[in-house]
């Protein structure tokens, strides 16, 4: 029962993390920078993995999609690959989890389901690590440019998508670890010492022995009386 409850908790945590990681891909604010006037914000610069935009004080945005993939910076290409890999691994991890959980009717025996659940945990951990690496790589680029005194272009700050990605990656890793530990709970089967058969047999043996003794005595007496 405890193993089933832990698997349900792990599934909910992992799925929540996977949803958060998936939501970072279309999120706009991976990095953001604002130009403030004396009264209002005159412009907001922001970018994600696919485009860079500027929004003026009236709320009108002008966006420019990134050029060909071969012309992109290396860190953007790496972040794209890592985040897409994280989403894909989370999808397969959720399928493995559905087959490996005890509360489902698919997946075979309990032993086979425990192995599938452990595999789902490993896949979720890999998904979380990919997301964590991608967000950290992007954040490292932002902070390096921000604190570089020789960098004269527009400087950005960390956007909301990075924090969402880190949170989702943490949930995926936590859920995957719980899935991996659930296989140890499945292997702990209770052992019982059964000594009832020995006591029953010994009592039966004594009973039959006494019965034989009683039945043999009358036969001997009958024989003696017959000859007399």
UniProtKB/Swiss-Prot annotation:
- Topology in the lipid bilayer: Multi-pass membrane protein
Q: Which domain of life is it from?
A: Eukaryota
Q: Which Pfam families match?
A: PMP22_Claudin
Organism of provenance: Pongo abelii
User: Under what name is this protein listed?
Assistant: Claudin-10
Single GO BP term:
monoatomic ion transport
Could you name the Gene Ontology cellular component terms for this entry?
bicellular tight junction; cytoplasm; plasma membrane
Q: Which chain regions cross the lipid bilayer?
A: 1-21, 81-101, 116-136, 161-181
């Amino acid at each position: 029962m405890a193993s089933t409850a832990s698997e349900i908790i792990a599934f909910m945590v992992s799925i929540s993390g996977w949803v958060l990681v998936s939501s970072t891909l279309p999120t706009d604010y991976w990095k953001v920078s604002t130009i403030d006037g004396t009264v209002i914000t005159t412009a907001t610069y922001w970018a994600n993995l696919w485009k860079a935009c500027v929004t003026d004080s009236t709320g009108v945005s002008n966006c420019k999609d990134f050029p060909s993939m071969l012309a992109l910076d290396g860190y953007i290409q790496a972040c794209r690959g890592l985040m897409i890999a994280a989403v894909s691994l989370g999808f397969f991890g959720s399928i493995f989890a559905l087959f490996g959980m005890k509360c489902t009717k698919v997946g075979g025996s309990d032993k086979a389901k425990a192995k599938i659940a452990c595999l789902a945990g490993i896949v979720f951990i890999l998904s979380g690590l990919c997301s964590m690496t991608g967000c950290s790589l992007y954040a490292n680029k932002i902070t390096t440019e921000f604190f570089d005194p020789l960098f004269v272009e527009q400087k950005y700050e960390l956007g909301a998508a990075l924090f969402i990605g880190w949170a989702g990656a943490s949930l995926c890793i936590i859920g995957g670890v719980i899935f991996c530990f659930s296989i140890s709970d499945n292997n702990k089967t209770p052992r019982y010492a059964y000594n009832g058969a020995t006591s029953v047999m010994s009592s039966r043996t004594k009973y039959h022995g006494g019965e034989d003794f009683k039945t043999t005595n009358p036969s001997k007496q009958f024989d003696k009386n017959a000859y007399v």
